[in-house]
Amino acid sequence: MLFKTLSLAAVAALSLATPALAEDVTVTLTGVEARGGVIVASLQTRGEFMQTSAAHADRVERPAAGSVRLTFRGVAPGDYALMAMHDEDADGRMKMNGYMPAEGWAMINGDALRGPPTFDLVKFTVSATGTDISVPMTYPR
């Protein structure tokens, strides 16, 4: 009887340790301006936040004005930050004007930022069934 109870406990523990299935995250960037170049976007975990690489990335060459839709496949449930930039000259770097971006960018809650972003301010949660979000682009004037 003890062996049977331990076996059931082991099966239960293994089933709880199984990672959640990965799903798709669809991001719609609104307010995109036709400025040439490329829109580069990534989903970043807390550990990847504000780094140059992330496990989930996508890009759109020469985006047209309006909305751009990106799909990130195989994203595990959890908290992520969306980082997007409109790299107008496609040099792979965000141009800055002092401390402000000189190219288009987007983050969750980006319009509410009054200083450098933190993961907790710009994160969103990916559910076990996938997630669809819409985020406005911000362009310098």
PLM regions and their residue ranges:
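A short, amphipathic beta-strand motif
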Residues: 25-32, 41
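Hydrophobic loop/turn residues within beta-sheet-rich immunoglobulin-like superfamily modules
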Residues: 32, 73-75, 127
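A glycine-anchored, Pro-Gly-centered beta-turn/N-cap motif
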Residues: 66, 71, 76-79
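A short tyrosine-centered beta-strand micro-motif
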Residues: 80-84
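Acidic, glycine-anchored loop motifs typical of Ca2+
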Residues: 88-96
